[in-house]
Amino acid sequence: MRTPLFVAMFVLSIFATPIAHADDAWMQSQRQWREQRAEALSQPDGWLSLVGLHWLAPGRHSVGKAADRDIVLSAGPDALGELELSEQDGVDRVRWYPPKDVVALRYNDAPVGTESIEVGADSSDHPGVITWSGGSVQLIERGGKLGLRVRDAEAPTRTHFQGLAWFEPDQRWEIKARFEAKPAGSTIPIANVLGQLEATPNPGRVVFEIDGNHYTLEALGDPAESLFLIVADRSNGKQTYGAGRFLYTDAVVGGEVMLDFNRMVNPPCAYNAYSTCPLPPPENRLNLAVEAGEKTYQGAH
């Protein structure tokens, strides 16, 4: 005859097992996500491959790795041709004149001849990237300034990459938040590491609770796809990167969104000196230490 104690233990075993499996699955999901994060960073065109940033002045400039170029790159062919920055109808435009001695260059993955090409900045509808074997130059626009972002697959920051440091995943840092939408067209001033300030679309804010305390974060991005949060907290400059961290979410559903601080990551500036990272707005400085997500990067940068 089975005793009540036996029955109780049997029932508990049935219900305990799925919970343990769920925790195991959650932990595995976190580890897999972190592996994917490191893999993305270390791709040939990832943030670890940045080796230069050159701001353009008006006029026509020779570009390449050779020392006699007007703009000397740290990677790529000796002669990359010429780039001309001019104003047309009140708009700054950049035209690329490929070198006459054609090397294996491509523009947006298409072969390049000797005809000039208008290069689109990363903020335009038709961004352009000049590539060669193992590297690239991309035109970027920041605060009305145009510059060349240079990548090299053999950059020491990439080839010597030793991985990322993380806090141990903790489900307590996976928090459901309420999304409070703002009127269409709302913006918030966002500063970047260059000292520029730009009015950035601000669709709303997230409201959440930790240990009985209420917090809010101003959100960027598209609620129908993913919110982008630039966050500072009291761990910055200690266990985590001094200039704050980024957090991306899934889409807002039914006025709610999940904030998984275990997936808070460092901005690109944590890995190299050539990024133009946005900084947390004053509204997003949390008065607590978020001991979750990515820690301070220990590699060369």
PLM features: residue spans?
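Surface-exposed beta-loop interaction hotspot
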Residues: 131-198
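An exposed acidic His-Trp-rich patch
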Residues: 109-123, 214-263
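Flexible, glycine-rich surface segments
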Residues: 178-236, 241
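Boundary at the C-terminal end of the N-terminal hydrophobic targeting segment
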Residues: 20-22
